[in-house]
């Protein structure tokens, strides 16, 4: 029997679909920078630029708008982790993580006087990116599977120059991605930056097929399942099971068995692996991908049920469109269906997931979510100490 948390403790939550820290830069005044975090960068940028309600007081000034996102750090597996990183990035002069790395070109003390009492620190894009480089090399954050996505060629150039003179290299867990396809001015409004972040998928659509496959495998009572590592029989109602994320692989394993295998192959003494080769298909899978599907299956039954319903509905729509020869656009496209479900998910969206924490056997089945909630307007609020003027 798998033990469960006491009833008075919060229920476990699924890993967020997406959470990132970001660096904003004022288009009108490029020396003005802002550090924040969000589960939805497209909507957050709209808020900062005043198109929707929310944002932060320090980005409301017309003398600084519009803002553009020039760098995002993605891959956080919880809101708490993203907020920890955000705070450390904002307060490099006091965070305990920087001091464990080096005391080279970046000085942890504030040498530049603030512009005024409410404007923060005088700084620059190179310095902020240098602080980021140090954080990613720290003992604490350096073990996280994060991706630094550059949306500005200028920001990436600053990063490269810093990398060349830094004392150390980024750990293998940190990846750098270039995303320059939307630089320049918007075709709709020349006063706005082209990169509105709408091309970034911040929804769970990426794990729908994985969830569908897991549901099919684990809910088939006629199918005998065995761990790919230890070869022992698996019980969908008693074992914590991970399912390979590769599309055509049906490998299942004990989470502990696969974790130990990946750690051994990595030669790591850590507790949580980063990635590894599936023992069945021999293709590389990331541990985060496996845990995101597992956490949704175990702790996000309502959302998982909605995802599977929309996956099946979208496939039906796709089949209908293929069979139609009219060439007309079908109403409620896949993007429309998915967008309607995720538009109101925010920093606090996980609080709406109601998962029983009783002492019942573990069940990998998804129950129907009968209780629907009305749409409400959600305003993102964040700290007031992350603007650098």
UniProtKB/Swiss-Prot annotation:
Domain GIY-YIG: from-to ranges: 17-99
Chief place where the protein resides: nucleus
Keyword list, A-Z: DNA damage, DNA recombination, DNA repair, Endonuclease, Hydrolase, Metal-binding, Nuclease, Nucleus, Zinc, Zinc-finger
Ranges annotated as SLX1-type zinc finger: 227-281
Biological process, per Gene Ontology: double-strand break repair via homologous recombination
Organism domain of life: Eukaryota
Protein's cellular compartments: Nucleus
Database matches in Gene3D superfamilies: GIY-YIG endonuclease (3.40.1440.10), Zinc/RING finger domain, C3HC4 (zinc finger) (3.30.40.10)
Molecular-function GO term, any one: 5'-flap endonuclease activity
Alphabetical list of InterPro entries matching this protein: GIY-YIG_endonuc, GIY-YIG_endonuc_sf, Slx1, SLX1_C, SLX1_endonuclease, Znf_RING/FYVE/PHD
Region of interest (Disordered), ranges: 38-59
GO-annotated cellular components: Slx1-Slx4 complex
Function: Catalytic subunit of the slx1-slx4 structure-specific endonuclease that resolves DNA secondary structures generated during DNA repair and recombination. Has endonuclease activity towards branched DNA substrates, introducing single-strand cuts in duplex DNA close to junctions with ss-DNA.
Full protein name: Structure-specific endonuclease subunit slx1
Origin species: Talaromyces marneffei (strain ATCC 18224 / CBS 334.59 / QM 7333)
Gene symbol of the encoding locus: slx1
